[in-house]
Amino acid sequence: MAGFQLSELKLTGYFPGVVGKITEFHATYYYENWGFDVSFETQVGRELSEFLMGFQEKRDGFWVATIAGGFAGAIAIDGRQAGKEGARVRWFIVTPGFQGKGIGRTLLRKSIEFCKEAGYKRIYLWTFKGLEPARYLYELEGFRLCKEHEVRQWGQDIVEQMFKLNLEP
């Protein structure tokens, strides 16, 4: 959508159909740009559904970005294992038409703010090498690369990367 103002951005939570939208945008984007196969789409849909079925408001976060009622992106914080590795950033996506316009930064900052308020000591996320705009955003917000390894996953050879953000003073 051309010509929108960031002030038009609304962050909401769950609404009917959003699991399908998030899964669809992940599947389409990663198929078209990276050749990911059906196992990626089914994993996103299954794990996102499981997360939302067990969602606990004080432990987990889930935000959907919309502009003029249209889906623009999403992000979640999965706090189920926060005592071990930290709270996990998941299902972070901004639709291609809205990338590079501040929506990703808004979503990521909202998730970091939630983690601070929840008292989490660390936040982490898994991604893969080659997503440079996302990496730039993660590093801009203080995340640091702490692990990487080669893996065959979703029909492709990729280099998985783990980024962490320490929230302790």
Task: Name each model-derived stretch.
Residues G3, S7-K10, K121-P169:
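C-terminal "cap" of GNAT-fold acetyltransferases
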Residues T95-K101, K129-G130:
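Active-site acidic-Proline motif in GNAT/NAT acetyltransferases
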Residues L9-G97, R105-K110, F114, A118, ...:
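Acetyl-CoA-dependent GNAT
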